[in-house]
């Protein structure tokens, strides 16, 4: 099996390493639009810009030609889109224009499209309707609690591939399920993708609570009530609320809200310290998807009349309408309710 990964950021590089541990030499290709980045990887044996300290398998083929990266694949191979959510639309459009035969496609990004509040698979379906040449592709999402650095280092990890295609799930499992990585399968794309989007926003809230020294009780309340918000939204959109109790919901939420490697948690910590969002993002150096999708999640909840107070407050904090301290006061001042 050949595996092509589009995007040589931290997660793309990590998942390429995982695939290379299983596949034969030359079967795993890592594409980057930046030739200087690939030269640096070839020279040093690691992606110093995004995954420093992790030596990459020498069998990974480094690719700068987008067309070659796509056209090397057959209908039995796997294409992995490892761009951020902001790059998904453009990347999948390019893929569909070049595809000459059915492809197996998964994406790793988590979030919603700004302005439209579309889930990743809905973005893919939109682009498929515009650029498809009558070819039926199989597609899905790979998600779950995973820091790229730990995956790159080969540490234990469990993820979920979500797709309506059983064969795609089996291909993804064949590519990545080995050694210290387990891959579970699901047919609930909505639940898996929304869990990955909402948990990033909730991780910012947890970071704010920790940064304000509100205590472990407060953190537990944020995670528990945040999970309830996630489940309500998943059900309203048409997914399975029970999916939120798995790896891509509560599992990813726990990791992102409490792990020190979490960029979204770090945003919350620094907001609580009084730093401005532009300053935080400039120092971060990498994408924090919770910042980008908070407004989109809030818009989707309003459209569907789903109550998500923690998520809504995070949207107000990130847009500068509320300070972290005022957001806490508003949340704690809400009327008593039955727990649902």
Curated annotation (Swiss-Prot):
Membrane-crossing residue ranges in chain numbering: none
GO molecular function, one term: NAD binding
Pfam families reported for this sequence: NAD_Gly3P_dh_C, NAD_Gly3P_dh_N
Residues bound to NADPH: 11, 33, 110, 148, 263, 287, 289
Enzyme Commission code: 1.1.1.94
Family of the protein in this entry: Belongs to the NAD-dependent glycerol-3-phosphate dehydrogenase family.
Function: Catalyzes the reduction of the glycolytic intermediate dihydroxyacetone phosphate (DHAP) to sn-glycerol 3-phosphate (G3P), the key precursor for phospholipid synthesis.
Protein name as it appears in the record: Glycerol-3-phosphate dehydrogenase [NAD(P)+]
Organism of derivation: Polynucleobacter asymbioticus (strain DSM 18221 / CIP 109841 / QLW-P1DMWA-1)
């Amino acid at each position: 099996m050949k595996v092509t990964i589009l995007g040589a950021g931290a997660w793309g590089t990590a998942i390429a390493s995982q695939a290379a541990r299983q596949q034969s030499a030359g079967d795993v290709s890592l594409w980057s639009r930046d030739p200087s980045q690939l030269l640096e990887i070839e020279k040093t044996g690691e992606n110093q810009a995004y995954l420093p300290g992790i030596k990459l398998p020498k069998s990974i083929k480094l690719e700068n030609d987008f067309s070659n990266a796509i056209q090397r694949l057959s209908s039995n191979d796997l294409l992995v889109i490892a761009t951020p959510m902001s790059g998904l639309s453009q990347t999948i459009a390019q893929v569909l224009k070049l595809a000459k035969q059915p492809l197996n496609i998964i994406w790793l990004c988590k979030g919603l499209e700004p302005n439209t509040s579309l889930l990743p698979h809905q973005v893919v379906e939109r682009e498929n309707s515009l650029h498809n040449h009558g070819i039926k592709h199989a597609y899905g999402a790979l998600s779950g609690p995973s820091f790229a650095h730990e995956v790159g280092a080969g540490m234990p990890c469990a993820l979920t591939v979500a797709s309506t295609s059983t064969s795609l799930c089996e291909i993804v499992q064949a590519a990545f399920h080995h050694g210290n990585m387990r891959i579970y399968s699901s047919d609930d794309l909505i639940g898996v993708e929304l869990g990955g989007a909402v948990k990033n926003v909730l991780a910012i809230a947890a970071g704010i609570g920790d940064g304000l020294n509100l205590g472990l009780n407060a953190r537990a309340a944020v995670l528990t009530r945040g999970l309830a918000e996630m489940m309500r939204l998943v059900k309203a959109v048409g997914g399975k609320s029970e999916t939120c109790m798995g790896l891509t919901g509560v599992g990813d939420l726990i990791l992102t809200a409490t792990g020190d490697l979490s960029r979204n948690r770090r945003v919350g910590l620094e907001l609580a310290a009084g730093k401005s969002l532009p300053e935080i993002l400039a120092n971060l150096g990498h994408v924090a998807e919770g910042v980008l999708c908070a407004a989109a999640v809030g818009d989707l909840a309003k459209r569907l009349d789903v109550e998500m107070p923690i998520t809504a407050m995070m949207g107000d904090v990130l847009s500068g309408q509320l300070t972290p301290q005022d957001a806490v006061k508003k949340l704690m001042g809400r009327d008593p309710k039955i727990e649902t």
